Amino acid sequence: MSLETSTTTPAGSPLSDRELDLIDKYWRAANYLSVGQIYLLDNPLLKEPLSAEHVKPRLLGHWGTTPGLNLVYAHLNRIIRNRDADVIYVTGPGHGGPGLVANAYLEGTYSEVYTGIEEDAEGLRKLFRQFSFPGGIPSHVAAQTPGSIHEGGELGYALVHAYGAAFDNPYLVVACVIGDGEAETGPLAAGWHSNKFLNPVTDGAVLPILALNGYKIANPTVLARIPHTELEALLRGYGYRPITVAGDDPTDVHRQLAAALDEAFDDIAAIQGVARGGGEVQRPVWPMIVLRTPKGWTGPKVVDGKRVEGTWRSHQVPLAETHDNPEHRAQLEEWLRSYGPEQLFDDDGRLRAELRALAPTGDRRMSANPHANGGLLLHDLDLPDFRDYAVPVTRPGSVTHEATRVLGTFLRDVIARNKDRFRMMGPDETASNRLDAVYGATEKVWLSATEPDDEHLAPDGRVMEVLSEHLCQGWLEGYLLTGRHGLFNCYEAFVHIVDSMLNQHAKWLATSRELPWRRPIASLNYLLTSHVWRQDHNGASHQDPGFIDLVANKRAELTRVYLPPDGNTLLSVADHCLRSRDYINVIVAGKQPALAYLDMDAAIAHCTRGLGIWDWASTARSIGAEPDVVLACAGDIPTLETLAAADILRRELPDLAVRVVNVVDLMRLQPDSEHPHGLPDREFDALFTRDRPVIFAYHGYPWLIHRLTYRRANHAQLHVRGFKERGTTTTPFDMVMLNDLDRFHLVIDVLDRVEGLASRAAMLRQRMVDARLAARMYTREHGEDDPAIANWTWEPSERNSRSE
């Protein structure tokens, strides 16, 4: 367990000649199946010479990384059998999909999951035909692949997913292959630091395997071209002990890799044994493997006079014209026959018994490990009753609170009751986001050195903080995919850093929902706070509500967006999201002192509906009476400004019939034909009318509301105010004025939109224009908002006090 680097040698190999021969054949079988998937439509066992009819007309797939993935898989199987180890396999180079499909088939799992693909010659034909073929399976290690928790299409997340899977899984080892191209990405570079958060007592282990095959699509890789001493120094600096395996002779590499894996697993067992024996938990130096083998190994060495094996040319399809080019087709047949398929499969196309015996059985197969189908292991959270954390509200808009601070007390007890299955992630923002009540039940995970002034750091904390949104999301995804629960809290503007990760997770969920053998997992829950309307102190760089738009673009059955206006609605929404499965939930809530509007019973009813009329804030109250105008709002600050506008209107224009509608569940605005939460037209029209002006104050970019409602009968009368990319360092009210979302402008919108009102209320309009000017002048003179604006509360009028 020292920091010295060791390179294994054949002399120390634990393999007998017989074992080596069998492992080599198993590797050849996986390689044969991989090549067959890329190229063949028929003739899977080469019972006759290859013809054009046997070859796919359109070749898709990636060969270059695949033999390396198959090599590691075969050797991990030996480790699992010999040690009864619990191992899952994460493949960063996910474009090596044919290799993982091949290994799942060799282990028998594939035929168990997809019963139409039998373990015989016809099953092989179907296996080959379906790969990267219309109506078949994709080219990457997607959700369709048994044993996968990581598609590896978009590069950078393999290592962080692996660590997420290992947290709170003390007996699991996650073998994670990292491509040397992927190692150039930012998330992967940060991911090496995950070992500083891995507790050897309560967590499992991650074994990184850096696959140095030297090339990306068309370029060399950085880590393959720096001196090996420099590479090892880099990895030691990250806190790992690298064990190097290098070569291009299969026999030599087999012996090296077997010894390297034995050494690594011995090291892991020793680290965990010491840590679990008692005493102070310290950060260990974990082993890892550097595997330097040729790209496209065992494939064609030269094609059309150009080197292929060991170069970038082997990345995808080394022989690209096999359907129409007889020379390429002959070379493909030679390549396939080089694996000796008659030595690997019997006459019926079944893997020979002595090779099948090399694979683990049951749940120990990496392709059948339940950790890679996390819904099988998922247990409900033991949630406290969120109603016990309610903000007392005797009258709407009269009590001030901090919504996320209220939520923090609830999350504190969620953590206390679920110490083995719930974690909270944040990029150094948990306290800033007013969630620090959680430290009453736990600490922040930290295994590095500490200083006397540090607070809330411990090896066994349930809060994970690192200043990388990529790591926060990646850890959480790995944690969820292996059957646990969590929450990612983040500044609203900076969650955009993981936009693309959300895209990939949404694609995974969409696919897994269509697979009956994939069990539902806990939802990916985002809490976005420190939001656009209260980042007046940090300025434009911190002001961007566009993550909602990204989520709204995703498939309707996956996504939910909630904008609770106060603490009690936030509690109700959070409880709902933590209980949900297979969704991406986005909650946007404020952290600054704000008004509370609904008592808990009213909040629950409102959140259950997803939107509704706030009768106590409306003046259009008579049964059967149509409003003159609808004031709609979504988000805490738009709600505040809408209510303040309604207050002005009821005082200045008492005969104007105003209806206030608040929206919590944004997807309720869509028709029910477009989203499961969507409102039928008749219900939408009942709330928003078919012909009256609707002034909609919205938290984010206003055009999203138009997108969600464009099919509605009254869309032409819908006028939305929201964020228009006008921000700076200023006061809270100046921020809403910059974007025409302020109460005075909302009143002006009403006067301009309600037929016949503009001329009758011209003086009120002028006063609203003057009020905006006065508010701005006050900020320029005093550096803060006018107290009459900043301290506004809702006061009941005689007309509607009865409902309050």
Curated annotation (Swiss-Prot):
GO molecular function: aldehyde-lyase activity; magnesium ion binding
Presence of the UniProt keyword Lyase in the record: yes
Cofactor requirements of the protein: thiamine diphosphate
EC number: 4.1.2.-
A Pfam family assignment: XFP_N
GO biological process, one term: carbohydrate metabolic process
PROSITE patterns reported in the protein's UniProt record: PHOSPHOKETOLASE_1, PHOSPHOKETOLASE_2
Keywords: Lyase, Thiamine pyrophosphate
Keyword Glycosyltransferase: no
Superkingdom per UniProt: Bacteria
Similarity comment: Belongs to the XFP family.
PANTHER family, sorted: PHOSPHOKETOLASE-RELATED
HAMAP family associated with the record: Phosphoketolase (MF_01403)
UniProt protein name: Probable phosphoketolase
Species the sequence originates in: Mycobacterium avium (strain 104)
